[in-house]
Amino acid sequence: MTYAPVTDVLSGKLAVDSEVTVRGWIRSRRDSKAGISFLAIYDGSCFDPIQAVVPNELNNYQEEVLKLTTGCSVEVTGKIVESPAKGQDFELAATEVKVVGLVEDPDTYPMAKTRHSIEYLREVAHLRPRTNIIGAVARVRNCLSQAIHRFYHEQGFFWMSAPLITASDCEGAGEMFRVSTLDMANVPMTDAGEVDYDKDFFGKETFLTVSGQLNAETYACALSKVYTFGPTFRAENSNTSRHLAEFWMVEPEVAFADLDDAAKLAEDMLKYVFKAVLEERRDDLEFFAQRINKEAITRLEQFVTSDFAQVDYTDAIQILQDSGRKFEFDVEWGIDMSSEHERYLAEEHFKAPVVVKNYPKDIKAFYMRMNDDGKTVAAMDVLAPGIGEIIGGSQREERLEHLDKRIAEMGIDASHIEWYRDLRRYGTVPHSGFGLGFERLVTYVTGMQNIRDVIPFPRAPRSANF
């Protein structure tokens, strides 16, 4: 017996009159007066369910088929036939229906056949992938993830696994989750009245990582081109639609590369993954265009054919000041541009993706390369129409004396990153990279309004269920 994914049947990959078995779950059941039941069966392999036409001649028709409700799992065997109805080209003429699992109480099943609010679905995150919308998000998320790995592999990059537990604060923001095995009811203290981390598991204070960048730099300075792709954590008490406490980051790092090289890599990567999702998940994107954001497809198509605009931060500030627009947040040199500023540049002024370069040093991290003017660093943000910042990156400071000066200016304990300073002592090279928040990318592609709906189990302030 041939087991076939629903997508293979609906796409015509299997020949008409082939006998196959489809395994999945009931989306709906409709009974006709002619003694035939129509089962809509999905298995997650594509957006659309397949229709199985079940005659009442089957032995278990009365006892089992007529008791099938939304969510029941089945194995249906039958012949692939051309569908006379609109909506799909093929359906299954069932010769056997095997009930694998029933829904205990259809009346209380949380995913009963009705339209649920996206807020409600967050409360039942363990069941929400069964819905059309979250199932589509999951497939798009997978497609983007695979495309990212494929892109870097084709470009000659090596994937490296950055540690999740670290003693370093890459961004210097201090918003980190502490990792400890100390007994919170009996915390050991030093004579100075401080927590004695020497008694802790690692013998020092440790945290969940906010970025794999510093670790990636060590491997880029040996393998030339590397990238990390994994979870990162921020203990930022922001209960908004744009923030998560746990999220995934894509962080490439390239030796012998300057800021322009990083900007070109970012453009090439985004266009590659957007082309991939347009080709591979068209069915899901059509759903998002119909239900979530009517521009879900057109803006991706425009993105991949657009030339990226380039602008210095100083010039971008001048553009905003000369716009005549009244912004909620005032515009002046030295600010960290807000989303409204970023979107104005991308959507109204340039009408294209924009790379903003050379930011004031005071709003950027210690590791970014100081420019000759002494006021700005070789940093960049990629701004996308419809969302604003989607990528942030920089050329790293490869000169030890400049790095040490920045470390001192920002009050960072250099002893914690002595290993990072070693990279500048032993065969230092210019190198650059960037970070892409993966969930931000998924929200952009799908048009979903809340970042908590594009990751399977969102972690946020006072929310760590499942």
Swiss-Prot record:
Protein name, entry field: Asparagine--tRNA ligase
Domain of life per record: Bacteria
Gene Ontology biological process terms in this record: asparaginyl-tRNA aminoacylation
EC number of the protein: 6.1.1.22
Protein keywords: Aminoacyl-tRNA synthetase, ATP-binding, Cytoplasm, Ligase, Nucleotide-binding, Protein biosynthesis
Main location per the UniProt record: cytoplasm
Annotated GO MF terms: asparagine-tRNA ligase activity; ATP binding; nucleic acid binding
GO CC, one annotated term: cytoplasm
Disulfide bonds: none
Keyword Thylakoid attributed: no
Subunit structure as annotated in this protein's UniProt entry: Homodimer.
Family: Belongs to the class-II aminoacyl-tRNA synthetase family.
Name of the gene: asnS
Family matches, as Pfam families: tRNA-synt_2 (PF00152), tRNA_anti-codon (PF01336)
PANTHER family: ASPARAGINE--TRNA LIGASE, MITOCHONDRIAL-RELATED (PTHR22594:SF34), ASPARTYL/LYSYL-TRNA SYNTHETASE (PTHR22594)
Classification via SUPFAM superfamilies: Class II aaRS and biotin synthetases, Nucleic acid-binding proteins
Organism expressing this protein natively: Photobacterium profundum (strain SS9)
Location in the cell: Cytoplasm
InterPro entries: Aa-tRNA-synt_II (IPR004364), aa-tRNA-synth_II (IPR006195), aa-tRNA-synth_II/BPL/LPL (IPR045864), Asn-tRNA-ligase (IPR004522), Asp/Asn-tRNA-synth_IIb (IPR002312), NA-bd_OB-fold (IPR012340), NA-bd_OB_tRNA (IPR004365)
Catalytic activity: tRNA(Asn) + L-asparagine + ATP = L-asparaginyl-tRNA(Asn) + AMP + diphosphate + H(+)
